[in-house]
Swiss-Prot record:
Entry keywords, A to Z: Isomerase, Rotamase
Acidic residues bias locations: 208-218
Chemical reaction(s) catalysed: [protein]-peptidylproline (omega=180) = [protein]-peptidylproline (omega=0)
One GO location term (cellular component): cytoplasm
PANTHER family on file: PEPTIDYL-PROLYL CIS-TRANS ISOMERASE, PEPTIDYL-PROLYL CIS-TRANS ISOMERASE D-RELATED
InterPro entries: Cyclophilin-like_dom_sf, Cyclophilin-type_PPIase_CS, Cyclophilin-type_PPIase_dom
Stated role: PPIases accelerate the folding of proteins. It catalyzes the cis-trans isomerization of proline imidic peptide bonds in oligopeptides.
GO biological process: protein folding
Name this polypeptide is given: Peptidyl-prolyl cis-trans isomerase cyp11
Species annotation: Rhizopus delemar (strain RA 99-880 / ATCC MYA-4621 / FGSC 9543 / NRRL 43880) (Mucormycosis agent)
Biased composition (Basic residues): 223-242, 329-338
CDD domains in the record: cyclophilin_ABH_like
GO molecular function: cyclosporin A binding; peptidyl-prolyl cis-trans isomerase activity
Domain of life: Eukaryota
Length: 338
């Protein structure tokens, strides 16, 4: 748990002397710490008892004893006789587990047991005689030099400062991590995870080769089982869809569908039989018969084209031409070559 932090901006007679940053022990005294935090922010509005803003802003340190403490928080009377908590007039003591064993501690002021309001004090030395009587709820984490300056302010015979030592501004500080802090944390976590993974891999690699082979075989078996299960699941889904569609249909529609399926199956059977018979007849025929049938099936145009392609065209010879010579009985006709 991260404890909240608040701040006081201190002015002496209107002159800013610095800022005090305070950590509240919300993990040990949450009720007391919440009272102080809310009075620093002023978020609770007007008090039910005093009808005044529940806010430390503008209040003064009305009592300062050098070598002991600086007391403030009376925003109702500004004399040490007033004050109001966010819970009402006062609230009980929460815990005395923290001791007044050092300087810079924040403790609740009271008029006896269970009379805490809004008044508090900051110690400037260890004060063990206050243990068990006042609740310690915070500590100064920065700006203790400002507390020392307040401690050295002149006071009258009633320990009231001669100058106006006022809380000019106060509030809660929001924890903001630096830009690279989150990345560093994430990288640290990732590095740890990578180290763990590497250690696991090393431990696995240190095992026998036989165990690794067995593992690989088992993995392959699992994969094959998964593939088979997927195939079966697809088939089951299709069957379920068919069954669901059949259930949704009326009995007459189911009969009609079954008839159509029977007709389709009969047509398929007849087609298959015809194909088989035609194949058998083709096997019985000679190749010349097949060629003749193929030629018959062709159109006359295709036949003429086949003939033209098969026989090259030759120019006719003019027998009246004196250059044409006939050899033999007249079958071999040729033109003389020069």
């Amino acid at each position: 748990m991260i404890n909240p932090r608040v701040f006081f901006d201190i002015d002496v007679d209107g002159n800013r002397i610095g800022r005090i940053v305070i950590e509240l022990f919300a993990d040990q005294v949450p009720k007391t710490a919440e009272n102080f935090r809310a009075l620093c922010t002023g978020e609770k509005g007007i008090g039910k008892v005093s009808n005044m803003p529940l806010h430390y802003k503008g209040s003064i340190f009305h009592r300062i004893i050098k070598g002991f403490m600086c007391q403030g928080g009376d925003f109702t009377h500004r004399t040490g006789k007033g004050g109001e908590s966010i819970y009402g007039a006062n609230f009980p003591d929460e815990s005395f587990s923290r001791k007044h064993d050092t300087h810079g501690l924040l403790s609740m002021a009271n008029r006896g047991p269970n009379t805490q309001t809004s008044q508090f004090f900051i110690t400037t030395r260890p004060t063990p005689h206050l243990d068990g009587k006042h609740v310690v709820f915070g500590r100064v984490v920065s700006g203790y030099n400002v507390v020392e300056m307040m401690e050295n302010e002149p006071v009258d015979d009633q320990d009231r400062p001669l100058h106006n030592v006022m809380i000019a501004n106060c509030g809660e500080l929001v924890l903001k991590l630096p830009p690279g802090a989150l990345l560093k944390k994430a990288s640290a976590v990732s590095d740890e995870s990578e180290d763990e993974i590497k250690n696991r891999k090393r431990s696995r690699s240190s095992d026998d080769d036989s165990s690794s082979d067995e593992d690989s075989e088992e993995e392959e078996r699992k994969r094959t089982k998964k593939k088979r299960s997927r195939k079966h699941s697809k088939k089951d889904k299709k069957k379920k869809k068919r069954e669901s569609s059949n259930r949704k249909r009326s009995p007459e529609a189911n009969r009609h569908v079954s008839r159509e399926r029977r007709d389709i199956s009969r047509e398929k059977r007849d087609n298959s039989r015809e194909r088989r018979l035609s194949r058998k007849e083709d096997d019985r025929r000679s190749p010349s018969d097949k060629r003749k049938e193929d030629r018959r099936s062709l159109s006359p145009e295709k036949r003429s084209s086949e003939r033209r392609v098969a026989r090259p065209v030759r120019p006719r010879l003019n027998y009246n031409d004196p250059n044409v010579e006939v050899k033999g009985r007249g079958r071999f006709k040729y033109r003389p070559t020069y």
